[in-house]
Structures are given as structure tokens and as C-alpha cells.
Design a protein with these regions (language model features):
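Structural and coupling elements of P-loop NTPases
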Residues: 1-529
Length: 529
């Protein structure tokens, strides 16, 4: 197959949602329809616990939540699908934000009963900033939930999206009968039996036909016709160019646990979703069809195999082909590296690949060369924009609980921070270490991993901080900046890359500081424009 055809075949996307909206279930069902797994590992209800394929760290298995982004790939209808399954747990946002830098489009999963939740709002706003095409999947229709129109309004208002339904539910919860597929013009009847892999579809192009009454009953038929008429009047018709530009978001309804509505989503997705897109580097726009390879590290995962102390750097290929055993330039370190066993993924199963194309995610064994945001090229000096650190929301001092293991603790903290699990700030005054996370559960994860992977114990103390602000003075030698440093010295720290950070204890402090020191600018992400 030609290089251009290989690029056109690829679809790399992320699935994002609030905890428990059914994201991992949806991921598994997509794999099931893609023929990549024989049966989905039950995400609840199954008597035999198979363990979901995409949750593969020990702590995820124990708690039944996805903690780190895993990469899954399969072929479907001649397309190569790469899914980045992001942690939906409210405490794993940092990793999730970064995953969004590596996807070409996104599917947002929303729980029909809970509607839009705040976690989803944050993630979708990042997608909108980047103009990433979005498809919305409203899940769990076999349960009682909000009215479909109310949900669509909520999605439009809270997420700032402009939606158009491509499928619509017939009834809901107890009365749920199935879905009318607007995109393909057919009806899917719901049987409630998840063992049936593919549900029965009835082709149905003329919604006015009296056949409809026979299939779903008189009242539901009248209601469905009214609803579809309303949809055609109120919502815009689907336009692929608008979708690709990030201005229009199609909505699908279904129940992932019951395999319902998932195939329609997948069929439409492979048809409309974008192939790998060009990406902005700091110097120029890099297009996928360029001959020379360029890629960037968006995630580092330590100890994927507890038996070996290995780290894997996940690299998204942006242009050219990545070949095994060919030397590539590590831009930040300015040295050439060769990779004898680049991995492709299928959750925990890794396979060595000889050649990868734009849109693919490759795992490279790493002995400590990589940090998040690093670039690999064939010699060109460039780095990709948009892999920032966000200000954490929780801050705690980290203390060593076992004096004999100080070295292991330092190494563990270092590696976990490289992975981007949390952020480390070192206070200027006394060099005490503060760990900042996006959610409180992260502290447990760090403690657990330090102990189980590095043999080090730690304890925490609260540290009252509202936000971390990265500091950039207009003139580092000015009297004003010196005064700022003198007054705020207790709250000044350095992040891992030695950038100066001001740990503010309230929104009021931030405002006061900004008005008192106008030439000292404060940023809430570590990547300044």
C-alpha cells in the first residue's frame, strides 16, 4: 500500500468522559466490533470477572477505574483505528489533557442520567481550543434518564457545542425500544441481550410509512415522527466540513454495555472522522505526508511490566515513517538514538513493529532519555506546541517516611514526575518538596506506586495553595521583580524544569499581586505564548 494510502487509512481518536459514564465499556465494545477481542471484559454485571482489556495497571484492576491512558489499535472496514483510552476518573486530568495533544478527533461519552459533568466541560474546552472534531455518544439509554432534547440543550449550553443528532432514541429507560438511525435511515430494535453481538436493523427510509406502527406501536410511532420533524426544523443538517473544522458535533444515542448503538457510531465514525492532521511546531506546520519523520512524546509510562524496571515513551508520529533500527535525532538532547524494538499496542500486549505511519502511536523503551513533549526528527530542529502543564488543584508536602530509602524515594518521585503523574515544586526557602495534582486520588496512586515499584514510603502534609502561577517578569533585574521576590519568598518555588512558580493561597492574592506588580506576569499553564 502506498504511503499516502496508509495515512488515509488511519483514524486516531480519544474517548473522554466523566467517571462511570461508560467510557471503558465503549472502548471494549468498539474493539469487539472491530474483531480485536472475542468478548468484552466485564465492566460490572458479569459473573466472570475478565478484567477490562484497557485497564492494565495493578491499581486500576483493584479499583475498577482507568488510571492511565492506554493505547489500543484494531482494523475495521479497511481503516486502522487507534484509540487512546483516557482516564475518566476525576483525578487523572493531567494525563488526559496531554492525550488530547495526540488525537485527531474525539468521542465524548455522556451518561443519560447524569448529563454533562464538570470534568467533561474541562476536557471539551481543551478540544474546542484546539478545534478537534468531536462526536458525542449519549450512553446508558436502557436506564431512566433525562429527556433527549433536554440533554442536547445541556450539551450545547454547558459544552458550548453546536450539535446535530444522527440517531435518536425511541422511548427511554423502561420504555426504551430502540433507536432510529438518522444517518443511515434505519431502525434498530433493542432486545436488552448483550450476548447478541450485532442487533437487528430494519431499513426504514420512509418514516411516514404505516409499517412504523406495526413495529414500535401507535403512540411511540406518532411521538417519533413528531420528534424527527422537530429535529429537522431545529438542528442543522450534518455537514462534514463543519464537523472537521470543529464547528458542528454529531450526537449518537445508545447503550454500550448492551452493545447497542455502538456499531452505528463506529460505522459513521470511520466514514466521517479525519485522517491524521497537520500539527503546528514552533517553527512551521508539519504535514503528515512529508517524507521525513517527526513525532513527539505525549506520555511516559514507567514499569508497565513490574518484573522489569522499564519505561515506555509513547510517541505520536506526525509525519513520515518511523522505522525500526533507523537513527533519529532527539532534539532536546541533540543526539541520535536508534530503537531496536519499537512497540505497537493492544493494551497490555505489545508487538514489535518495523514501520509506523503518521497517526500511529509507537512505544519506545526508554532508559531516562525522554520527557513529555520531547521531539524526534530526522535532523530538523523543532518542537511541537501545545503540551503544557496546567496548574494543579491540590498541593501537599511530601515527606520521606523511611530514612534508609531516601535514594529510592528521590528516584521514584523523579520517574513519576517524568511520567507526568503529578507536578513537583521545590520551595526556594528550604528546598522542601511539594507535589501538586489535579485530583486527590493521585496522592494514593503515587504512594502506592512508590511503595510497590520503588520500595520507598512517603507521607504527606497539607499545604494551603489555591493555584500555581508560573512567573515571567518583564525585566528580571528590575527593582519591582526583586521586591516581588522579597515579599513572596515563602511562596516561591521552582518546577521540574526550573521555572519560577508562585504558589498563591487565594484568588484574591493573585489579583492583589497582579495589581501591585504590573510588570510581573502570572500564567496558569507552564507553556507561555
Amino acid at each position: 500500500m502506498s504511503f499516502l494510502k496508509e495515512i488515509q487509512r488511519r483514524r486516531t481518536f480519544g474517548i473522554i468522559s466523566h467517571p462511570d459514564a461508560g467510557k471503558t465499556t465503549l472502548t471494549e465494545k468498539l474493539l469487539l466490533f472491530g474483531g480485536a477481542i472475542q468478548e468484552a471484559g466485564a465492566v460490572k454485571n458479569n459473573k466472570i470477572k475478565k478484567g477490562a482489556t484497557s485497564d492494565f495497571m495493578e491499581i486500576e484492576r483493584q479499583r475498577g477505574i482507568s488510571v492511565s491512558t492506554s493505547v489500543l489499535a484494531f482494523n475495521y472496514k479497511g481503516k486502522k483505528i487507534n484509540i487512546l483510552d483516557t482516564p475518566g476518573h476525576k483525578d487523572f486530568a493531567e494525563d488526559t489533557f496531554r492525550t488530547l495533544t495526540a488525537v485527531d478527533s474525539v468521542i465524548v461519552v455522556i451518561d443519560v442520567a447524569k448529563g454533562v459533568e464538570e470534568q467533561t466541560e474541562k476536557l471539551v474546552s481543551v478540544c474546542r481550543m484546539r478545534h478537534i472534531p468531536i462526536i458525542v455518544f449519549i450512553n446508558k439509554l436502557d436506564r431512566e434518564g433525562k429527556d433527549a432534547f433536554d440533554l442536547m440543550d445541556e450539551v450545547e449550553q454547558k459544552l458550548g457545542l453546536n450539535v446535530t443528532p444522527l440517531s435518536f432514541p425511541i422511548g427511554m429507560g423502561y420504555d426504551f425500544q430502540g433507536i432510529y438511525n438518522i444517518w443511515e435511515q434505519n431502525i434498530n430494535l433493542f432486545s436488552g441481550d448483550s450476548r447478541k453481538n450485532i442487533e437487528d436493523t430494519i431499513a426504514f427510509s420512509d418514516i411516514e410509512s404505516p409499517e412504523l406502527e406495526k413495529i414500535i406501536g401507535e403512540k411511540p410511532a406518532v411521538k417519533l415522527r413528531d420528534e424527527l420533524e422537530l429535529i429537522s426544523e431545529v438542528y442543522p443538517a450534518f455537514d462534514r466540513d463543519q464537523y472537521l473544522a470543529g464547528n458542528l458535533q454529531p450526537i449518537f444515542f445508545g447503550s454500550a454495555l448492551n452493545n447497542f448503538g455502538v456499531r452505528e457510531l463506529l460505522d459513521c465514525f470511520v466514514e466521517i472522522a479525519p485522517a491524521p492532521r497537520a500539527k503546528e511546531s514552533e517553527t512551521r506546520l508539519v504535514k503528515p505526508e512529508e517524507e521525513k519523520m517527526a513525532g513527539f512524546v505525549f506520555k511516559i509510562h514507567a514499569n508497565m511490566d513490574p518484573k522489569h524496571r522499564d519505561r515506555l515513551a509513547f510517541v505520536k508520529i506526525v509525519s513520515g515513517t518511523f522505522e525500526r533500527n533507523k537513527p533519529y535525532m532527539h532534539v532536546r538532547l541533540n543526539k541520535n538514538l536508534k530503537f531496536s524494538s519499537p512497540n505497537a499496542f493492544f493494551a497490555e500486549k505489545k508487538e514489535i513493529v518495523d514501520i509506523s505511519y503518521p497517526g500511529d502511536i509507537v512505544g519506545l523503551h526508554d532508559t531516562g532519555n525522554f520527557k513529555i513533549g520531547d521531539t524526534l526528527t530526522e535532523g530538523e530542529i523543532m518542537s511541537f506546541k501545545g503540551i503544557p502543564s496546567f496548574s494543579p488543584e491540590h498541593f501537599r508536602y511530601i515527606n520521606n517516611a523511611d530514612p534508609l530509602k531516601a535514594k529510592q524515594l528521590d528516584k521514584g518521585i523523579d520517574q513519576l514526575m517524568d511520567e507526568g503523574v503529578a507536578q513537583l515544586f521545590t520551595l526556594e526557602m528550604n528546598n522542601r518538596k511539594i507535589i501538586g495534582t489535579v485530583g486527590a486520588l493521585q496522592y494514593e496512586v503515587i504512594q502506592y506506586r512508590l511503595e510497590h515499584e520503588y520500595g520507598a514510603k512517603c507521607s504527606y502534609e497539607n499545604f494551603p495553595v489555591h493555584k500555581a502561577c508560573w512567573v515571567k517578569p518583564k525585566d528580571a533585574k528590575s527593582e519591582e521583580f526583586k521586591e516581588f521576590k522579597r515579599i513572596k519568598q515563602k511562596f516561591l518555588a521552582h518546577d521540574k524544569y526550573d521555572q519560577l512558580v508562585f504558589l498563591a493561597d487565594s484568588e484574591f492574592t493573585i489579583q492583589m499581586t497582579q495589581s501591585k506588580f504590573p510588570t510581573v506576569t502570572l500564567f496558569f499553564t507552564s507553556e507561555f505564548e
